Protein backbone atom coordinates (compact mmCIF):
# COMPACT_ATOMS: atom_id res chain seq x y z
CA UNK A 1 0.00 0.00 0.00
CA UNK A 2 1.21 3.56 -0.66
CA UNK A 3 2.17 5.47 2.48
CA UNK A 4 1.63 9.08 3.49
CA UNK A 5 3.64 10.78 6.24
CA UNK A 6 1.78 13.58 8.04
CA UNK A 7 3.83 16.39 9.64
CA UNK A 8 1.99 18.17 12.44
CA UNK A 9 1.08 21.82 12.79
CA UNK A 10 2.21 23.78 15.87
CA UNK A 11 1.12 22.18 19.13
CA UNK A 12 -0.95 19.63 17.24
CA UNK A 13 0.14 16.04 17.91
CA UNK A 14 -1.43 13.40 15.71
CA UNK A 15 -3.74 12.24 18.51
CA UNK A 16 -5.43 15.66 18.54
CA UNK A 17 -6.79 15.20 15.01
CA UNK A 18 -6.98 11.42 14.97
CA UNK A 19 -10.10 11.15 12.72
CA UNK A 20 -8.05 12.63 9.86
CA UNK A 21 -5.94 9.48 9.68
CA UNK A 22 -8.59 6.77 9.10
CA UNK A 23 -10.39 9.08 6.67
CA UNK A 24 -7.28 9.40 4.52
CA UNK A 25 -6.50 5.71 4.98
CA UNK A 26 -9.95 4.85 3.62
CA UNK A 27 -8.65 5.86 0.19
CA UNK A 28 -6.11 3.04 0.28
CA UNK A 29 -3.14 4.65 2.02
CA UNK A 30 -1.12 3.69 5.06
CA UNK A 31 -1.11 6.99 6.97
CA UNK A 32 1.65 7.71 9.47
CA UNK A 33 2.05 10.44 12.08
CA UNK A 34 3.70 11.14 15.42
CA UNK A 35 3.09 13.14 18.57
CA UNK A 36 5.57 15.96 17.94
CA UNK A 37 3.94 19.37 18.39
CA UNK A 38 7.05 21.20 17.14
CA UNK A 39 7.80 19.42 13.88
CA UNK A 40 8.98 22.36 11.79
CA UNK A 41 12.57 21.29 11.23
CA UNK A 42 11.57 17.92 9.80
CA UNK A 43 13.69 15.89 12.20
CA UNK A 44 10.94 13.86 13.82
CA UNK A 45 9.36 13.17 10.43
CA UNK A 46 12.73 11.80 9.33
CA UNK A 47 13.01 9.66 12.48
CA UNK A 48 9.47 8.38 11.97
CA UNK A 49 10.26 7.52 8.35
CA UNK A 50 13.33 5.57 9.47
CA UNK A 51 11.09 3.57 11.80
CA UNK A 52 8.65 2.83 8.97
CA UNK A 53 11.49 1.81 6.66
CA UNK A 54 12.62 -0.73 9.24
CA UNK A 55 9.31 -2.21 10.38
CA UNK A 56 9.86 -5.30 12.57
CA UNK A 57 9.02 -8.58 10.88
CA UNK A 58 6.29 -9.30 13.44
CA UNK A 59 4.49 -5.98 12.80
CA UNK A 60 1.04 -6.02 11.22
CA UNK A 61 2.48 -3.59 8.64
CA UNK A 62 5.42 -5.82 7.69
CA UNK A 63 5.38 -6.39 3.94
CA UNK A 64 2.39 -4.08 3.48
CA UNK A 65 4.11 -0.78 2.57
CA UNK A 66 5.01 0.16 -0.99
CA UNK A 67 8.26 1.99 -0.30
CA UNK A 68 8.37 3.26 -3.88
CA UNK A 69 5.07 5.10 -3.38
CA UNK A 70 5.44 7.34 -0.35
CA UNK A 71 4.20 10.90 -0.01
CA UNK A 72 4.46 13.54 2.68
CA UNK A 73 2.01 16.25 3.74
CA UNK A 74 2.19 19.01 6.32
CA UNK A 75 0.18 21.96 7.56
CA UNK A 76 1.42 25.33 8.89
CA UNK A 77 4.62 24.64 10.86
CA UNK A 78 4.28 21.11 9.53
CA UNK A 79 4.37 22.47 5.99
CA UNK A 80 7.84 23.81 6.67
CA UNK A 81 8.58 20.50 8.38
CA UNK A 82 7.53 18.54 5.31
CA UNK A 83 9.79 20.62 3.07
CA UNK A 84 12.67 20.20 5.54
CA UNK A 85 12.04 16.45 5.79
CA UNK A 86 12.25 16.15 2.01
CA UNK A 87 15.22 18.43 1.42
CA UNK A 88 17.39 18.38 4.57
CA UNK A 89 17.50 14.69 5.44
CA UNK A 90 19.01 11.79 3.50
CA UNK A 91 15.90 9.63 3.74
CA UNK A 92 13.81 12.49 2.33
CA UNK A 93 14.82 11.23 -1.11
CA UNK A 94 12.44 8.30 -0.56
CA UNK A 95 9.36 10.49 -0.97
CA UNK A 96 7.61 10.57 -4.33
CA UNK A 97 5.30 13.57 -3.82
CA UNK A 98 4.52 16.37 -1.35
CA UNK A 99 1.59 18.54 -0.32
CA UNK A 100 1.62 21.47 2.09
CA UNK A 101 -1.31 23.45 3.47
CA UNK A 102 -0.50 27.00 4.57
CA UNK A 103 3.18 26.22 5.01
CA UNK A 104 5.01 28.85 7.06
CA UNK A 105 6.67 31.22 4.61
CA UNK A 106 10.44 31.29 4.36
CA UNK A 107 11.23 34.29 6.57
CA UNK A 108 8.87 33.12 9.31
CA UNK A 109 10.24 29.59 9.09
CA UNK A 110 13.83 30.83 9.29
CA UNK A 111 13.06 32.97 12.33
CA UNK A 112 11.45 29.99 14.07
CA UNK A 113 14.32 27.59 13.32
CA UNK A 114 12.62 25.76 10.45
CA UNK A 115 14.67 27.17 7.59
CA UNK A 116 14.12 25.56 4.21
CA UNK A 117 15.17 26.11 0.60
CA UNK A 118 12.38 25.48 -1.92
CA UNK A 119 14.92 25.34 -4.74
CA UNK A 120 15.99 21.94 -3.36
CA UNK A 121 12.54 20.41 -3.98
CA UNK A 122 12.80 17.85 -6.78
CA UNK A 123 9.53 15.90 -6.40
CA UNK A 124 5.98 16.80 -7.48
CA UNK A 125 4.71 19.45 -5.07
CA UNK A 126 1.24 20.88 -4.48
CA UNK A 127 1.19 23.95 -2.23
CA UNK A 128 -2.05 25.49 -0.97
CA UNK A 129 -3.00 28.29 1.41
CA UNK A 130 -5.98 30.48 2.27
CA UNK A 131 -6.81 34.02 1.25
CA UNK A 132 -7.99 34.94 4.75
CA UNK A 133 -6.09 37.49 6.84
CA UNK A 134 -4.44 34.85 9.03
CA UNK A 135 -2.66 33.39 6.00
CA UNK A 136 -2.20 36.68 4.11
CA UNK A 137 -2.48 39.87 6.16
CA UNK A 138 -1.87 42.07 3.12
CA UNK A 139 1.40 43.37 4.57
CA UNK A 140 4.72 42.98 2.77
CA UNK A 141 6.16 39.80 4.37
CA UNK A 142 9.69 41.12 3.84
CA UNK A 143 8.97 44.19 5.97
CA UNK A 144 6.71 42.73 8.65
CA UNK A 145 4.43 39.86 9.49
CA UNK A 146 2.51 38.98 6.35
CA UNK A 147 0.43 36.17 7.77
CA UNK A 148 1.52 32.54 7.93
CA UNK A 149 1.48 31.85 4.20
CA UNK A 150 1.05 35.04 2.13
CA UNK A 151 0.50 34.88 -1.61
CA UNK A 152 3.70 36.74 -2.50
CA UNK A 153 5.79 34.26 -0.51
CA UNK A 154 3.94 31.31 -2.03
CA UNK A 155 4.66 32.65 -5.52
CA UNK A 156 8.33 33.14 -4.57
CA UNK A 157 8.54 29.53 -3.36
CA UNK A 158 6.86 28.31 -6.53
CA UNK A 159 9.24 30.26 -8.74
CA UNK A 160 12.28 28.92 -6.87
CA UNK A 161 11.39 25.37 -7.85
CA UNK A 162 12.68 24.14 -11.20
CA UNK A 163 10.15 24.11 -14.03
CA UNK A 164 11.24 20.52 -14.62
CA UNK A 165 9.45 19.63 -11.36
CA UNK A 166 5.68 19.19 -11.47
CA UNK A 167 4.36 21.93 -9.22
CA UNK A 168 0.94 23.34 -8.40
CA UNK A 169 -0.03 26.32 -6.26
CA UNK A 170 -3.54 27.17 -5.10
CA UNK A 171 -5.43 29.50 -2.76
CA UNK A 172 -8.66 28.61 -0.95
CA UNK A 173 -10.84 31.70 -1.27
CA UNK A 174 -11.92 33.07 2.10
CA UNK A 175 -10.20 30.32 4.07
CA UNK A 176 -8.45 31.25 7.30
CA UNK A 177 -5.29 29.51 8.39
CA UNK A 178 -6.94 27.09 10.80
CA UNK A 179 -9.47 26.02 8.14
CA UNK A 180 -6.95 24.80 5.61
CA UNK A 181 -6.75 21.18 6.75
CA UNK A 182 -10.46 20.82 5.96
CA UNK A 183 -10.65 23.16 2.97
CA UNK A 184 -7.75 21.53 1.13
CA UNK A 185 -8.58 17.95 2.08
CA UNK A 186 -10.22 16.78 -1.15
CA UNK A 187 -7.55 18.29 -3.36
CA UNK A 188 -4.74 16.90 -1.21
CA UNK A 189 -6.31 13.44 -1.42
CA UNK A 190 -6.70 13.72 -5.20
CA UNK A 191 -3.06 14.82 -5.51
CA UNK A 192 -1.79 11.84 -3.53
CA UNK A 193 -4.03 9.39 -5.39
CA UNK A 194 -2.69 10.76 -8.66
CA UNK A 195 0.97 10.86 -7.64
CA UNK A 196 1.20 7.65 -5.61
CA UNK A 197 -1.26 5.35 -7.39
CA UNK A 198 -1.71 6.83 -10.87
CA UNK A 199 -5.43 7.31 -10.22
CA UNK A 200 -6.94 8.89 -13.34
CA UNK A 201 -9.75 10.67 -11.51
CA UNK A 202 -7.22 12.26 -9.18
CA UNK A 203 -5.08 13.24 -12.16
CA UNK A 204 -8.05 14.89 -13.88
CA UNK A 205 -8.30 17.41 -11.04
CA UNK A 206 -4.91 18.81 -12.06
CA UNK A 207 -4.45 17.94 -15.74
CA UNK A 208 -6.66 17.95 -18.82
CA UNK A 209 -9.36 20.10 -20.39
CA UNK A 210 -11.58 20.00 -17.31
CA UNK A 211 -8.85 20.37 -14.69
CA UNK A 212 -9.74 22.57 -11.74
What name fits each language-model region?
Residues 1, 43-80, 88-92:
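Gly/Ser-rich "nucleophile elbow"/oxyanion-hole loop immediately N-terminal to the catalytic nucleophile
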Residues 1-9:
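Short beta-strand element of the alpha/beta-hydrolase
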Residues 15-34:
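Short amphipathic alpha-helix adjacent to the substrate-entry channel of hydrolases
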Residues 19, 84-88:
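Active-site signature of alpha/beta-hydrolase-fold catalytic machinery across serine-
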Residues 34-36, 57-64, 198-209:
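Surface-exposed patches in mature extracellular/periplasmic domains of secreted proteins
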Residues 81-85, 109:
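Hydrolases whose catalytic domains are alpha/beta-hydrolase-1, hotdog thioesterase
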Residues 93-181:
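The feature captures the conserved acid-bearing segment of alpha/beta-hydrolase catalytic domains
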Residues 164-165, 173-212:
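Alpha/beta-hydrolase-fold serine-hydrolase catalytic core, especially in secreted/extracellular enzymes
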Amino acid sequence: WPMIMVVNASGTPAASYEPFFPRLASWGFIVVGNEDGQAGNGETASITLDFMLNIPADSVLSGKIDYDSMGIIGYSQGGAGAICAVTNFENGARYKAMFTGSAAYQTLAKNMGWEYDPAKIKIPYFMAAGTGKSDDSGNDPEKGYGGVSPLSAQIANYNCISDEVQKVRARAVGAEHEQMLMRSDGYMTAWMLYQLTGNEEGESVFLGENAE
